[in-house]
C-alpha cells in the first residue's frame, strides 16, 4: 500500500491543482492512507468531486480496506482500463497487484495466476524498466494453488455457535516446553480430533507447526516462502462451523515456533469470513450469533488491510494506526514515540523490552510513560505505566498494538466483519 501512496502523489498532484476542494481532500486521504477518514468523508463529498477517477479510487480503496475485496476487483479493473492516462502506469500496476491479491484471497487461484502471467508478458513486451519479482511470486504461488478449490465456510446459521476457550494451551506436543499462556485457545477439530488453536487476530493466515502438520497428514503444496510451506486441509471444524479447502502455512521453525511452542493458529484468512463473533470474557467462550449486532453510532471503526485488523483510535494528536492483535501483548512502537516526542522529554526511566512476530524476536530500548489516553468510538481508554520504544524496530508501520490485555479489559468484545466494527462492553 505504501508504494501506491507515493505513486498517487506523483501522478495525481498535477491534476488536483485545478481540482475542486473535494477532489483535493479525497486525494489527500488516499495519499496518507487515512482509510477511516476516507470512509467517513467520502459519502459527504462524493457529489462535489470533479474527476470521476478520484471518486472511483475512493470507492475502490474503501472496499479494499473494509473487507469487500471482491467488489474492489471490478473497480481496480475500471481504473486500469479506463483511467490509466489520469492515474499513470505506476498506479495502474499497484492497482493490478492489489486486484491479484484479491483474486487469491477470494480463492480464484487460476485466474490470479493467468492474470499475473499476462501482466508479466506485457511488461516484458513493453521494455519498461520495471522490476516484477512480486508478480513472479504471485504467479508461482497461485499456479501451485490452482488445483485446489476456494475455501468455503459452511454455517447453517440456525442457532448460535458457542465455542469455549481457555487462556492456557494444554495441547503441548513437545516435552519440556512451556506453552504460551494468557492467550485465547479454542478447540478446532481436524479428522475427528480436537486440537488447541490460538485465536489470533494479528495472524494474517492460519498456521500449523510442522510437527502438528505431519501428525494430521496435510497435503503439502509445491510452494514455499521465507516463513514456511503451504499445505492443504480438506476441512476443519470450529464448533458447528466447517471450513472446507483450507490453505494453511506450515511454519519453518523460527523462534515463534521453537520458543513460544505454538502449534496452531486460527488466522484472519478464516476468521474474517465469519460475519460476527462475540468474545465473552466472563464465561470464557466465543459466540457466533445468529442475530447480528447493530452498527454503533460511530459507524465503521474496524478495517482489514492485507488481512491485518486495525481499530479507529484517536488521541490528542489525531488518528493512531492501531493494530488489533489478540496474539500479542498491548504495546507501543517507535512511530508513536515520534508523534509524542515533545511530551516525553522530561520523562525518566528506561528498560529493554522484547517484541516479536513471525519474523522472530528483537529487543529495543523504551521509556516509561506513567499514563496514556486515547479514545475508541468515543469511549475513553487509559493505559498506565506503559513503555514506549525510543529506538526504531524493523517492520513497524503501526503506532500501537492493542493486544490480549486490551481484549481482557472488557466483559464482551464483539467483532463484526460484515459491517466492520468492534464494540467493547
Where are the predicted features?
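Bacterial Sec-dependent N-terminal signal peptides
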Residues: 1-26
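Pepsin/retropepsin-fold aspartyl endopeptidases
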Residues: 20-425
